[in-house]
Amino acid sequence: KGKDVNAMKATVISFLLMFGLLIAGCSDNENEEELPAPDVPDYSTIIVKGIQNMPKNFTFDRVEVKVTGLDWQVIETLIFPYENGQIVMTLPATFPSERLQKVDRRNGDMAGYWTGTSNDGDALVATLGDFFVFNGDTRVGRIALSNWSGKGSSAEKATLVSYQYADRPFILTGSDKSYYYSECSFNKGWNIFANINPSEGSSQKVLRTTTVPESTLFWRLAESYVYNK
């Protein structure tokens, strides 16, 4: 009888151990499933304020920016007022697919946007052009987002930033005579991308990337078309 009791105890202990391992395994799987998806940055609204390099007598009342798409054509002109020292640009949430541009120039197709190669050749894009500022009917200048003050050389890793809409995620790789692509992945919707210049005197190409040092960026008056007489 003593042997039977001991055998029964061993069986119960083994069962409990196996049950515990199963519970732990389920718990681990649940924890893995509960991990949140990485946050996708939202660039659908651009807020411009604290514009640098503006002369005291420089005034404007709005910004206009063209969106290019299919065959490099302008598919929309966006207009936003300059009010209370800032511009709030709410970008279109979507575009008709037939108005969008091919993502890259594979097979020598110059109608495509990027010189790098997309991992999804069916992706389509639309791109913001220059941010021109107006005072009434007169175009008085251009503003830009970068970490370059506009003084001296734009080399030494100056970052020049633009915005692009994508109809699906894609990743760019490759290089051409002037640019190379690294850490250049786009999400569905609006994205920020940068051209980062090499150091002065360097033989490196300009880096194109979506890994942008945003904390270093600021808006500035890049060009003024108003001349004091």
Task: Indicate residue ranges for each PLM-predicted region.
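Sec-dependent bacterial lipoprotein signal peptides
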Residues: 1-24
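Bacterial Sec-dependent N-terminal signal peptides
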Residues: 20-47
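Glycine-centered loop-to-beta-strand initiation motif
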Residues: 44-50, 63, 76-96
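Short, ordered, surface-exposed loop/turn motifs in non-cytosolic proteins
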Residues: 54-71
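Short beta-strand and strand-turn-strand segments in soluble, beta-rich domains
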Residues: 69-76, 175-178
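Short, exposed beta-strand/loop patches in secreted or surface proteins that constitute
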Residues: 77-81, 132, 183-184
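Long, low-complexity intrinsically disordered regions in eukaryotic proteins
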Residues: 94-168
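Extracytoplasmic cysteine-anchoring/structural motifs
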Residues: 154-229
